[in-house]
UniProtKB/Swiss-Prot annotation:
Organism of derivation: Cynodon dactylon
Keyword terms of this UniProt record: Allergen, Glycoprotein, Secreted
Expansin-like CBD domain location: 159-240
Pfam families associated with the record: DPBB_1 (PF03330), Expansin_C (PF01357)
Protein name: Major pollen allergen Cyn d 1
Compartments in which it is found: Secreted
Any one Gene Ontology cellular component term annotated for this protein: extracellular region
Residues in Expansin-like EG45 domain copies: 39-145
SUPFAM superfamilies, A to Z: Barwin-like endoglucanases (SSF50685), PHL pollen allergen (SSF49590)
Disulfide cysteine pairs (residue numbers): none
GO BP annotations listed: plant-type cell wall loosening; sexual reproduction
Glycan-bearing residues: N9
Assigned protein family: Belongs to the expansin family. Expansin B subfamily.
Length: 246
């Protein structure tokens, strides 16, 4: 039975049984992405565009996991009301919701909520406002050729570097990020700042280029040498040559 207390954290187990959750949707555009600024508590700014395409969700704490659940992928489906197709659709976690209405709660974009409907019944399903859905964690897949990217956040400097990690396939979510500056022989752990953003506040100035090591929830590691150049700039995206499972 669904209660109003959060359930156990959802971990990276695949092929698992379907669990039950409550679903709502948010945003001023019932057919579009949400939130209205196309951002959210994970730190993304473009959830209306590929590869998210507006198919996004706010998870409550067992799903969001204080930001460590950002980017995780879920199949969702509904059986009732009659407008539900019963066919699973894929959503990615890009935001957090704080409503204690169920053990598990997906606050979906209007587009994602409507995607659970039979063809042509999307608007009717959205009129339900709230329903029970079934969900399960699945591996994240991105279009062929998509590589992991690093967005250096505004305000970063030689004594404060913040990275937003995007487009990680497989587990989707990252549980550790380590950085190796030019003048270091060892990787230095970064701290989880908020959402999908990781930061480091070194005592001595940082000097690039920087190598980055990522660890996924399932324990997979990727290392990209010198992915961030010596002349890096804030509010800039740097694309790696790597992808989990590639």
């Amino acid at each position: 039975a669904i209660g109003d207390k959060p359930g156990p954290n959802i971990t990276a187990t695949y092929g698992s049984k379907w669990l039950e959750a409550r679903a709502t949707f948010y945003g001023s555009n019932p057919r579009g992405a949400a939130p209205d600024d196309h951002g959210g508590a994970c730190g993304y700014k473009d959830v209306d565009k590929p590869p998210f395409d507006g198919m996004t969700a706010c998870g409550n704490e067992p799903i969001f996991k204080d930001g460590l659940g950002c980017r995780a992928c879920y199949e969702i489906k509904c059986k009732e009301p009659v407008e539900c197709s019963g066919e699973p659709v894929l959503v990615k976690i890009t935001d957090k919701n704080y409503e204690h209405i169920a053990a598990y709660h997906f606050d979906l974009s209007g587009k994602a909520f409507g995607a659970m409907a039979k063809k042509g019944q999307e608007d009717k399903l959205r009129k339900a406002g709230e329903l029970t859905l079934q969900f399960r964690r699945v591996k994240c897949k991105y279009p062929s050729g998509t590589k992991i990217t690093f967005h250096i956040e505004k305000g970063s400097n030689d004594h404060y570097l913040a990275l937003l990690v995007k487009y990680a396939a497989g587990d989707g979510n990252i549980v550790a990020v380590d950085i190796k500056p030019r003048d270091s022989d060892e990787f230095i752990p970064m701290k989880s700042s908020w959402g999908a953003i990781w930061r480091i506040d070194p005592k001595k100035p940082l000097k690039g280029p920087f190598s980055i090591r990522l660890t996924s929830e399932g324990g997979a590691h990727l290392v990209q040498d010198d992915v961030i150049p010596a002349n890096w700039k804030p509010d800039t995206v740097y694309t790696s040559k790597l992808q989990f499972g590639a």
